[in-house]
Amino acid sequence: MPGLHLDNCVARQVARLLTEAGYSVVTAAELGLQRAPDGRQLLEAAQQGRVFISHNANHFTSLHDAWHLWSRSWGVAALHAGILLIPHALPRVEARYITEIMASGWPLANELYRWRPRGGWVRHPTP
């Protein structure tokens, strides 16, 4: 099971709940990346083999698409452990969204999933 990297915008209480559920979790603050740009956050998660989790759907959808397009253009592997985009909710609800997909058996590597209130987890098509 891959570890998790929580973006600055995800509450620390979510990290605590996920840790209590048995996940290996790091936060941007723990890594000293609280002011790092989004691309740096995603790169750090990819280098550590951790699934990246954020509320910032627009930025990370664009980064995910660019990651795949540029990797294909440059002839390199587009490897990251996955990106999960969640809406703002109570920490216990956010943790439930995350544990649900982590336990689903769905492929996460190099994929982006977004939680939709009317449909649950939806895979973003790879460009």
Question: Model-found features: residue ranges?
Answer:
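Acidic, metal-binding active-site segment of PIN/NYN-like and related structure-specific nucleases
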Residues: 38, 44-46, 50-65
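Structured helix-beta-strand junction loops
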Residues: 21, 48, 80-81
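Short, mixed-charge, low-aromatic patches
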Residues: 1-2, 16-20, 53-59
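Conserved BB-loop
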Residues: 24-36
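Short, charged N-terminal beta->alpha structural module
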Residues: 10-20, 24
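Acidic, PIN/NYN-like endoribonuclease modules and their adjacent C-terminal/linker elements
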Residues: 2-8, 12, 33, 39-42, ...
